[in-house]
């Protein structure tokens, strides 16, 4: 693969929204991750704890019930 195509793919991967986007993201349901009562994201959003990898690039994240940071609160919900 030439350098131009590699750099384009690199920037596309960097620009992917990780965790919760502007309109919310419920994550991807993968059987190995849902058995832990968790979901898969491109990176754990604030308020989620990392557990394992899902399919090598996704992160299996579990919602934190205690000690959630202030960033975990959804600004769109009043």
Swiss-Prot record:
Cellular location(s): Secreted
Name of the molecule in the record: Defensin beta 136
Pfam families referenced in this protein's UniProt entry, alphabetically: DEFB136 (PF17333)
Molecular function terms from GO: lipopolysaccharide binding
Primary site of residence: secreted
UniProt keywords, alphabetically: Antibiotic, Antimicrobial, Defensin, Disulfide bond, Fungicide, Secreted, Signal
Transport among keywords: no
Organismal lineage: Eukaryota, Metazoa, Chordata, Craniata, Vertebrata
GO aspect biological process, one term: defense response to Gram-negative bacterium
Cysteine pairs bridged by disulfides in the record: 33-60, 40-54, 44-61
InterPro entries reported for this sequence: DEFB136/42
Signal peptide: 1-21
One cellular component term from this protein's GO annotations in UniProt: extracellular region
Family statement drawn from the similarity comment of this UniProt entry: Belongs to the beta-defensin family.
Organism (species): Pan troglodytes
SUPFAM superfamilies: Defensin-like
Function, in words: Host defense peptide that exhibits antimicrobial and antifungal activity. Exhibits antimicrobial activity against E.coli, S.aureus and C.albicans (in vitro). Has high lipopolysaccharide (LPS)-binding affinity, and may thereby be involved in immunoregulation through LPS neutralization.
């Amino acid at each position: 693969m030439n350098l131009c195509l590699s750099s384009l793919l690199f920037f596309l991967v960097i620009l992917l929204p990780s965790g919760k986007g502007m309109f919310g993201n419920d994550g991807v349901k993968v059987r190995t991750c849902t058995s832990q009562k968790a979901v898969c994201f491109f990176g754990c959003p604030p308020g989620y704890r990392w557990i394992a990898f899902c399919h090598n690039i996704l992160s299996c994240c579990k919602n934190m019930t205690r000690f959630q940071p202030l960033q975990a609160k959804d600004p769109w919900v009043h």
